[in-house]
């Protein structure tokens, strides 16, 4: 695994352009499996996870071409519905090809997924949803096989928790079950859900209510060719916003959707960050003092996002008092805390809540990245810290941040990557 060397402290300034959303691109690329004609996707970020999902489509027999953030997908002439373990193990989102493949071709097999190790992230909701849609499910030797049986005319699925992955999986699968009317309650409301629904509708599907807790899907028989542009990555935008504030910098963040990050901006303002909205797609972040302590609760959208939890803890580690961050989505998502302590942070974790006792500054050290967003948090910490910070096993960061070394360098950071 690679290593990132950061010389700090930095003060980020300038401008950074946000890439297309990883969390929107992955389910949309997976949904391309149901296309009867070609689809063209624009603003697709060039990331390890995106490349893996494209490999999965190629394994299924699709014909793809990916260049300059544009992906074309054409349906297979001879489909393969048994997706190999070596692809699926790399990331959790790969499991979302099971339902679309089985709905399209009658039967499919996918290994249980891999991805970030950040606590319990069960696929039970996915499987229960597929069963209600008329699929028989068999799990043997780590492989899940779904086979389409008699299609129900009316289906009501109520998720116990508004899972993003389960919402996307069920929505995409139900979209091509011709003759089936599906109501999905307690659905996730994230912007990526809306983007997926817009893509499905661009293909001729009939999905209504995405972005609310109740989604209605009328299955269609055929889809049409379409062109769709992926929304900006709100997690990347939020990460850079926190990084600028944490380094007491002054920078403009471009090509984001400001309305997607209201919860983050509320927290940053409470901590004393100056945020100037230039327009709907650009903001200026400015900070010239240590942050004020705040209380943050991590909840499903439109609340504060779990994927920005490690970053905000890092920012608050130099606050002028004691802050708390309570995690309600992935309660064990605190592996980064031990690494932050190595840099001088004073943090306790108790029953899903991090208690952060602000210190005056951090100091560079060797640390290990435990997952994608933890890696991003450690990068921010390295930018904040005095001296040299060496982040080992940092390759995970390339799963979610396009050209991060180049972007940070353009913001005046001193960052170097070693394989």
Curated annotation (Swiss-Prot):
Per the annotation, which location comes first and is thus the protein's main one?
cytoplasm
Q: Where does phosphoenolpyruvate bind?
A: 22-23
UniProt EC number: 2.5.1.7
Asked if Protein biosynthesis is a keyword of the record, the answer is no
Could you tell me the keywords of this UniProt record? Cell cycle, Cell division, Cell shape, Cell wall biogenesis/degradation, Cytoplasm, Peptidoglycan synthesis, Pyruvate, Transferase
Query: Which pathway does it take part in?
Result: Cell wall biogenesis; peptidoglycan biosynthesis
Question: So where's the catalytic machinery, residue-wise?
Answer: 116
The record ties this protein, via CDD domains, to: UdpNAET
Q: Name one GO molecular function term.
A: UDP-N-acetylglucosamine 1-carboxyvinyltransferase activity
Q: Which residues carry this modification: 2-(S-cysteinyl)pyruvic acid O-phosphothioketal?
A: 116
Under InterPro entries, the record lists: Enolpyruvate_Tfrase_dom (IPR001986), Enolpyruvate_Tfrase_sf (IPR036968), MurA_subfamily (IPR050068), RNA3'P_cycl/enolpyr_Trfase_a/b (IPR013792), UDP_GlcNAc_COvinyl_MurA (IPR005750)
Binding residues for UDP-N-acetyl-alpha-D-glucosamine, per the UniProt record? 92, 307, 329
Q: Which GO terms describe its cellular component?
A: cytoplasm
Q: Where in the cell is it found?
A: Cytoplasm
Swiss-Prot/TrEMBL GO biological process terms:
cell division; cell wall organization; peptidoglycan biosynthetic process; regulation of cell shape; UDP-N-acetylgalactosamine biosynthetic process
Function description: Cell wall formation. Adds enolpyruvyl to UDP-N-acetylglucosamine.
Q: What is this protein called?
A: UDP-N-acetylglucosamine 1-carboxyvinyltransferase
Gene giving rise to this polypeptide: murA
């Amino acid at each position: 695994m690679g290593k990132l060397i950061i010389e700090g402290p930095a003060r980020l300034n300038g401008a950074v352009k946000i890439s297309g959303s990883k969390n929107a691109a992955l389910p949309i690329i997976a949904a391309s499996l149901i296309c009867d004609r070609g689809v063209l996707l624009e603003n697709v970020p060039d990331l390890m996870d995106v490349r893996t999902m494209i490999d999965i489509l190629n394994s299924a027999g699709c014909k793809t071409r990916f260049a300059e953030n544009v992906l074309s997908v054409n349906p297979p002439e001879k489909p393969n519905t048994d997706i190999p373990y070596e692809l699926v193990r790399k990331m959790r989102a790969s499991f979302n090809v099971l339902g679309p493949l089985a709905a399209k071709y009658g039967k499919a097999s996918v290994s249980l997924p891999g991805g970030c190790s950040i606590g319990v992230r069960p696929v039970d909701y996915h499987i229960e949803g597929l069963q209600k849609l008329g699929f028989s499910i068999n799990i043997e030797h780590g492989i899940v096989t779904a086979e389409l049986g008699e299609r129900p005319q009316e289906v009501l699925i109520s998720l116990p928790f508004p899972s993003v992955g389960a919402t996307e999986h069920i929505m995409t699968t139900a979209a091509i079950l011709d003759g089936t009317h599906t109501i999905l309650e307690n659905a996730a409301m994230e912007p990526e859900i809306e983007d997926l629904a817009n893509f499905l509708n661009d293909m001729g599907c009939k999905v209504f209510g995405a972005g609310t807790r109740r989604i209605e899907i009328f299955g269609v028989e055929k889809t049409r060719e379409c062109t769709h542009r992926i929304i900006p990555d709100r997690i990347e935008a939020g990460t850079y916003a926190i990084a600028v504030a944490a380094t007491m910098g002054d920078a403009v963040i471009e090509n984001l959707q400001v309305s997607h990050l209201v919860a983050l901006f509320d927290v940053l303002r409470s901590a004393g960050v100056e945020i100037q909205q230039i327009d709907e797609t650009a903001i200026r972040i400015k900070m010239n003092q240590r942050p004020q302590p705040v209380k943050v609760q991590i909840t499903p959208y439109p609340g504060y996002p779990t994927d920005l939890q490690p970053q905000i803890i890092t920012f608050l580690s130099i606050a002028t008092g004691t802050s708390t961050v309570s995690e309600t989505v992935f309660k064990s998502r605190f592996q980064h805390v031990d690494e932050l302590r190595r840099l001088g942070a004073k943090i306790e974790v108790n029953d899903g809540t991090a208690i952060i006792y602000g210190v005056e500054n951090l100091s560079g050290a060797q640390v290990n990245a435990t997952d994608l967003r933890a890696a991003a948090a450690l990068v921010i910490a390295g930018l904040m810290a005095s001296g040299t910070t060496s982040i080992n096993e940092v390759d995970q960061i390339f799963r979610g941040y396009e050209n991060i070394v180049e972007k940070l360098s353009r913001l005046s950071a001193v960052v170097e990557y070693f394989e």
